[in-house]
Amino acid sequence: MSPKSPLHLTFLLFDGFSNMVLASAIEPLRAARDLSGRRLFSWQVSSLDGGAVTSSSRLAIAVDLPLERVGATDALILVSGYGMRAHLQRDSMLAVLRKARGLPVLGGLDTGAWLLAL
């Protein structure tokens, strides 16, 4: 990332994620960008298959693209909630690992960190 290019983040959502966790990650980025008057950050929201993801409060969230179509990104951040064990499918985790290969940052929010630890 050059000093003038924005930091681009990809948030990978899993069913059962917390809206509050996602908003707590994105809103400070938005505020910093808006208050600075510069495009410091950009982000996209993804799911494994590109379909809508249902939050823990039962809100269906449309995503920008499926994980396989995520291109250049500075960080891949997994966001999952209480049902994280259901996401521990071999194919799903292999897809995440393939996409994460070579990325500068791989992170997890809420139980997304737990998924990464396994």
Model-predicted segments: where are they?
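Aromatic-residue-lined binding/catalytic grooves and analogous aromatic/hydrophobic interfacial grooves
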Residues: 110
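Extended, subdomain-level signal for the structured scaffold at the beginning of enzyme domains
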Residues: 1-106, 115-118
